[in-house]
Regions:
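Aromatic- and glycine-rich beta-strand/loop motifs that create alpha-glucan
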Residues: 1-24
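Alpha-helical membrane-protein architecture signal
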Residues: 3-8, 115, 119, 178-182
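Membrane-interface helix-boundary motifs at transmembrane edges
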Residues: 15, 201-209, 273-278
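Alpha-helical transmembrane segments of multi-pass membrane transporters/translocases
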Residues: 23-26, 192-196, 241-285
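Central hydrophobic cores of alpha-helical transmembrane segments
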Residues: 24-28, 207-223, 282-284
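Alpha-helical transmembrane segments of multi-pass membrane proteins
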Residues: 27-42, 222-228
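Secretory targeting signals
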Residues: 32-95, 122-200, 204, 239-257
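Helix-loop-helix units of permease transmembrane domains in multi-pass membrane transporters
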Residues: 94-128
Length: 285
């Protein structure tokens, strides 16, 4: 109960007065408007069905073909909306855990334990990512309502192929409603949470700036290579799971994400006993 009380307090304080959320809303709206332009310019992409909410999710989380497979590196391009969203997802929970340790470290040692502090920060990181993802879902939902698009998680294989210039879809997964929920909601969220947990560990034990730079490096490397250890691949699920032949399967991706989250959490529990939580900022001394 002590851990959950701390986590609840952390989430409230971590969300309060964050100017990043208006920026996140703007980036989500840019993605939706880009999709709206696609609807107007290429209705043939949607086959016989009307554009749906699933199509909008697919457009935002599609990713691009791994650059290492391109004939020339001059074609190196990072999907701008995807990159901005990922940078904001990773930035949202980054600073608060360190600030809480700097400002209230002594109070944690007096009133609770290091282990409770770490567990609360893990729950905080997961909670912030879920809240931010729900915000994105709400924005896309409202966009679909305004555009009078079906609120459906159903689309077809031809749409996925069209996003990649006619490349075939290499997957035995039936692209059903539940298949799309896995591809477009569950897996991207798990990928974001796994990256944020890894970032939390590096931020607490090394430095938050180094942690964020490492996250940016993972994002860039994920555009180059389709490897499960590069966690950002799991947020480009159509590319990784459907378009790349011998790509990352849905089950494999879920196991990687959950495995990294569990590993980071357990390592934190083991190492936090020796963590100095009485660090003060220079201006506080």
């Amino acid at each position: 109960m002590e851990t959950f009380k701390l986590a609840k307090r952390d989430i409230v304080l971590g969300v309060r007065k964050k100017m990043r959320y208006p920026v996140f809303v703007i980036v989500c709206l840019i993605g939706c408007m880009n999709f709206s332009g696609l609807m107007e310019d290429g209705l043939e992409l949607f086959g016989k069905s009307n554009p749906s909410m699933a199509n909008c999710f697919a457009f935002i989380f599609q990713g691009i073909e791994p650059m290492i497979r391109k004939n020339t590196m001059s074609e190196f391009v990072i999907p701008p909306v995807w990159l901005m969203l990922m940078l904001l997802y990773l930035l949202m929970p980054l600073d608060y855990p360190i600030k809480s340790m700097e400002v209230w470290g002594s109070q944690y040692l007096i009133r609770t334990s290091r282990r409770s502090w770490w567990n609360a920060k893990c729950i905080y990181t997961i909670g912030i990512n879920i809240l931010t993802f729900l915000l994105q879902i709400m924005i896309i939902f409202l966009f679909c309502l305004i555009k009078q698009m079906p609120i459906s998680m159903h689309n077809n294989q031809k749409f996925y192929e069209a996003l990649y210039g006619g490349n075939g879809v290499h997957s035995s997964l039936e692209i059903s409603v539940w298949g799309n929920i896995l591809l477009l909601i569950v897996l991207p969220l798990l990928g974001i949470v796994a990256m944020s947990m890894f970032q939390l560990f590096v931020a607490v034990w090394i430095n938050p700036y180094i942690a964020y730079l490492l996250s940016i490096g993972i994002l860039v490397c994920s555009v180059l290579l389709d490897s499960p250890i590069l966690l950002a691949n799991h947020t480009m699920t159509i590319r990784s799971a459907l378009v790349c032949e011998n790509g990352i399967g849905i089950g494999e991706a879920i196991l990687w994400c959950i495995g990294i989250m569990a590993l980071v959490w357990i390592m934190g529990v083991l190492f936090v006993k020796k963590k100095d939580m009485l660090v003060l900022k220079k201006e506080d001394v």
